[in-house]
Amino acid sequence: MNKHALLNADMNYLVATLGHTDEVAICDAGLPIPAAVQRIDLALTHGVPSFIATVKIWLASSQIEGVVLAQEFADVSPECHQALLVEIEAEQLATGRTFSIEYVSHEAFKQRTHNSRAVIRTGECTPYANVIFKTGVVF
């Protein structure tokens, strides 16, 4: 059994096979997921698992270098947006790296998921609680 925080087999495999600049989305329960993109569906019920809990595990398991968010996220769901920024800031401090943060329209965000290696669906029911992480390198 894996003694690290990430126990999901599909997510572990994804982390192990990511390359530099590959993108992975973590989304709320309602984001449309393109049929051609790998879906890792963690959603059990409304709010379980949460978006932030899933982000925390992802950041502990995978090196990132960039973040893409929908512009609408900060306006419509400011508490969840701020919680995400806190996690990103903590990861920057822990790694000594600075990540780019890009804001795009929600429509552009949905289109960008077509290029993701995978979309990880949570049970989150907060509007626009979605993020795309661009993979970095550990060296």
Swiss-Prot record:
Entry's Gene Ontology BP terms: D-ribose catabolic process
Protein name, as recorded: D-ribose pyranase
Keywords, in A-Z order: Carbohydrate metabolism, Cytoplasm, Isomerase
Cited PANTHER family: D-RIBOSE PYRANASE
Compartment list: Cytoplasm
Family label: Belongs to the RbsD / FucU family. RbsD subfamily.
Listed pathway(s): Carbohydrate metabolism; D-ribose degradation; D-ribose 5-phosphate from beta-D-ribopyranose: step 1/2
Catalytic activity entry: beta-D-ribopyranose = beta-D-ribofuranose
Residues noted as binding substrate in the record, renumbered to the chain: D28, H106, Y128, A129, N130
Subunit structure: Homodecamer.
EC supergroup of this enzyme: isomerase
EC number(s) from the headed UniProt entry: 5.4.99.62
Residues annotated as the enzyme's active site: H20
InterPro entries for this protein: D-ribose_pyranase, RbsD-like_sf, RbsD_FucU
GO CC term (a single one): cytosol
Keyword Cytoplasm attributed: yes
Protein role: Catalyzes the interconversion of beta-pyran and beta-furan forms of D-ribose.
Molecular-function GO term, any one: monosaccharide binding
